[in-house]
């Protein structure tokens, strides 16, 4: 029409089956875990430091002497365990030291890795240092 440029029409059509699938999220490591190593120092045989990571963000468990409660947030391979509180039972010294290492490691954790071959869960800090290695209970 006169001196106006011709209009260009672009049609876009999706090719392929179904709707676009969102990126798959990792299967977060919820469930009950038993500490096998804390800070590279192993664990006491007679004490069980446990962790239960709930799908609802609740954390419960035991340092080996005292019960713990906290909150957890996952973001892909990231983890944040916050608001950790524990009962205040008197524990013998070796167990008390292990428990304090466990609690400190949990709140310092920023990344998680799940080894498909062994099923072990490893919690790491921001510098990729291993804080805790856990197995399914």
Predicted regions and their residues:
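Lipid interaction determinants
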Residues: 1-137
């Amino acid at each position: 029409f006169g001196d106006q440029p011709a209009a260009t029409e672009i049609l876009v059509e999706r090719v392929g089956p179904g709707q676009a699938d969102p990126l798959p999220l990792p299967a977060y490591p919820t469930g009950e875990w038993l500490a096998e190593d804390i800070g590279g120092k192993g664990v006491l045989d007679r004490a069980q430091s446990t962790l239960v990571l709930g799908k609802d963000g609740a954390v419960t468990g035991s340092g080996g002497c005292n019960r713990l409660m906290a909150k957890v947030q996952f973001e892909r391979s990231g983890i944040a365990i916050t608001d950790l509180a524990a009962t205040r039972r008197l524990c013998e010294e070796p167990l008390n030291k292990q428990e304090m290492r466990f609690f400190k490691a949990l709140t310092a954790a920023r990344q998680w890795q799940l080894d498909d071959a062994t099923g072990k869960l490893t919690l790491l800090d921001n510098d990729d240092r291993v804080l805790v290695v856990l197995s399914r209970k």
